């Protein structure tokens, strides 16, 4: 079946989104055209502005339309001297939602992966090293993902911190709240056992 070239182009464009295959893209395209053209126009305008105006924070490398993001420019976020290292800007949103962290961040935009040719400079570790040297940082919290690459990246950064006399800590990994032990994989259970703590009364 031959469809409109513009419709085909729209469906192909929608497929750039994660988890969106041909059928999902087709459904989205038809929904926008049939039922929500005003929503489609708002989406197009928001995408155009975001793609052209959003860049990276000069300090932490997260997404922002300013030179320095709101977190990095907030004096209160600098008081405790903590920097939390994450792989993605999305990780910042996840941590901020907990309300348990009041320091600053550094976004790697990935992780070390020698097999893929991704080295320290490719994920901004040269910039992180500059901050370790120039700023009054007391602790680096390593919140990379609990994958082989994430662990390797965390270990590399921990060694970097040691060179500058900065404490490095790793976020805990373990059994999720509400989870059942028989459903937890061996690696997660091993981390849980290794990271156990005393119960005091």
From Swiss-Prot:
Residue spans, zinc finger C4-type: 57-72
Molecular function (Gene Ontology), one example: DNA binding
Cited InterPro entries: DNA_Rcmb_RecR (IPR000093), Rcmb_RecR (IPR023627), Rcmb_RecR_Znf (IPR015967), TOPRIM_dom (IPR006171), TOPRIM_RecR (IPR034137)
Keyword Zinc-finger on entry: yes
Keyword Plastid: no
Gene Ontology biological process terms from the UniProt entry: DNA recombination; DNA repair
Recorded coiled-coil stretches: none
HAMAP family found in the cross-reference section: RecR
Homology family: Belongs to the RecR family.
Role of this protein: May play a role in DNA repair. It seems to be involved in an RecBC-independent recombinational process of DNA repair. It may act with RecF and RecO.
The name this protein goes by in its record: Recombination protein RecR
